[in-house]
């Protein structure tokens, strides 16, 4: 009985995984089983951290806005500032407000004065 060579499908799957794991260190980029395990773990971490990144940036923006507001002493808290912002129907999101707070504090001061009026 002649020897039958295996097909290319499994090899193609492994090379695809190997390309994904080529930047990993040690056995994680060399051994097939650990490569597949690390690939799954990397994808799980990426999926989890996409949601976490959104939360982290929102927290950073809120912290920056709060710091500048308390320094200006127009409002004594962040939540009063945001509440009055919504009451006056000034639609500025936290990302834009944080950029204004960092780059142009006088503009944020005029915004807060508009809210008070």
Swiss-Prot record:
SUPFAM superfamilies according to UniProt: Ribosomal protein L20
InterPro entries: Ribosomal_bL20, Ribosomal_protein_bL20_C
Keyword rRNA-binding: yes
Xref: CDD domains: Ribosomal_L20
Gene3D superfamilies xref list: 6.10.160.10, Ribosomal protein L20
UniProt-listed GO biological process terms: ribosomal large subunit assembly; translation
Top-level division of the source organism's lineage: Eukaryota
Intracellular or extracellular location(s): Plastid, Chloroplast
Alphabetized GO MF terms: rRNA binding; structural constituent of ribosome
Keyword terms, alphabetized: Chloroplast, Plastid, Ribonucleoprotein, Ribosomal protein, RNA-binding, rRNA-binding
Signal sequence segment: none
One Pfam family cited in the UniProt record for this chain: Ribosomal_L20
Disulfide bonds: none
GO CC term, one of those recorded: chloroplast
Family per similarity comment: Belongs to the bacterial ribosomal protein bL20 family.
Function comment: Binds directly to 23S ribosomal RNA and is necessary for the in vitro assembly process of the 50S ribosomal subunit. It is not involved in the protein synthesizing functions of that subunit.
Name the record gives this protein: Large ribosomal subunit protein bL20c
Gene from which this protein is expressed: rpl20
